[in-house]
Amino acid sequence: MVLAFWLAFFTYTWITLMLDASAVKEPHQQCLSSPKQTRIRETRMRKDDLTKVWPLKREQLLHIEDHDFSTRPGFGGSPVPVGIDVQVESIDSISEVNMDFTMTFYLRHYWKDERLSFPSTTNKSMTFDRRLIQKIWVPDIFFVHSKRSFIHDTTVENIMLRVHPDGNVLFSLRITVSAMCFMDFSRFPLDTQNCSLELESYAYNEEDLMLYWKHGNKSLNTEEHISLSQFFIEEFSASSGLAFYSSTGWYYRLFINFVLRRHIFFFVLQTYFPAMLMVMLSWVSFWIDRRAVPARVSLGITTVLTMSTIVTGVSASMPQVSYVKAVDVYMWVSSLFVFLSVIEYAAVNYLTTVEEWKQLNRRGKISGMYNIDAVQAMAFDGCYHDGETDVDQTSFFLHSEEDSMRTKFTGSPCADSSQIKRKSLGGNVGRIILENNHVIDTYSRIVFPVVYIIFNLFYWGIYV
């Protein structure tokens, strides 16, 4: 019994001593751990804390939850100044039919909101994306007379918000806008168009928001490589003004103005040059024998139809306006010249027929030389045909009876060329050509070109 007691006592004492030794050894091992491992452990703990706390610190720095941002800065006081500057990236298109233009640019707003001020020892600004825009006040700028507009969203929405410690804010957007341009086509295609993009606050009138160009005339910047296929950009300028609405009052308005001058070379090749060619081609009929009815009529009809096609093509590419354009003046005057060349031959043909009938009546041969079939044949091809009368006995007296007797030759005007070759070439061919030319054709060869040249001088002098 005594032996069992002592055995239990020594066992308890040994276990107690072992536990005390392990408790003393563990702190010693902790103390023996390397300083490097201690620093790594502390760094990890610090990073975990920063990841959890940093977003909360930014919200606290800007005091987002402590203010009501549904109202403008300085509500109830003077209007908040909002500066604007624009960097034009490109003018994508100009549409004459729709009377609009499409422009891509960077729009930057500058204002001060003391509710967003925060303490900073380095005086560095903080940059945010679009998510903060929904929580604070921003200017409600819109584009007057715009048809379509959107903010670019590749790869993310192109919105940037930068807040400075003193509360100054920069709000930047990349936007594409299609807006109206009230064009005047009275001088088209020798025209110059003045277009403008207008910016204005939608809700805040002059008592609440003052819109101005941040850097004056230098607030509007453009890329040097901007170019258009049909226009040359002469000038970019910035201006400002006030707009009045009867129901809400006066509003500040900013203008992005640009002047477009059309490239004329394209239209010279596509419109003016073909019209000139058709007019000059119509003059060829003045040099064709007046008895060659099919040749002159077909040439006149071809030039008239071609001019009609050119006029239709020009009108199809233009808006339907109620006034006369410069290109309309040129096209219709050119069409008039082509049409008059056809009328000129109709007059020549009629007068020639009347003159020949008078000559035949004076000689008393109308009954013997011209039967019904011969008259119909002459009306068809402009040549006299008679199978019963000897052709060598036929003579035409075109100017006077005395001249006709002097220049009488064998055969009709449409006789075979071999008959003419049998005549003496000592001036007879030239005399025959002169006798076949009507006086109207002779004058038309001079009058038509001279008048058309005078018209071109006046036209280009007025419109260019």
Curated annotation (Swiss-Prot):
This is Gamma-aminobutyric acid receptor subunit rho-3. Its main location: membrane. It catalyses: chloride(in) = chloride(out). Activated by agonists in the following the potency order: muscimol > TACP > TACA > thiomuscimol > CAMP > CACA, when forming a homopentamer. Inhibited by TPMPA, a rho-specific antagonist, when forming a homopentamer. Inhibited antagonists in the following the potency order: TAMP = TPMPA > P4MPA = THIP > 14AA > 3-APA, when forming a homopentamer. Residues 1-15 form the signal peptide. Glycans are attached at N123, N194. PANTHER family: NEUROTRANSMITTER GATED ION CHANNEL (PTHR18945). NCBIfam families: LIC. It is a multi-pass membrane protein. Keywords: Cell membrane, Chloride, Chloride channel, Disulfide bond, Glycoprotein, Ion channel, Ion transport, Membrane, Postsynaptic cell membrane, Signal, Synapse, Transmembrane, Transmembrane helix, Transport. Disulfide bonds join C181-C195. The chain crosses the membrane at residues 264-284, 297-317, 329-349, 444-464. InterPro entries: GABAA/Glycine_rcpt, Neur_chan_lig-bd, Neur_chan_lig-bd_sf, Neur_channel, Neuro-gated_channel_TM_sf, Neuro_actylchol_rec, Neurotrans-gated_channel_TM, Neurotransmitter_ion_chnl_CS. Belongs to the ligand-gated ion channel (TC 1.A.9) family. Gamma-aminobutyric acid receptor (TC 1.A.9.5) subfamily. GABRR3 sub-subfamily.
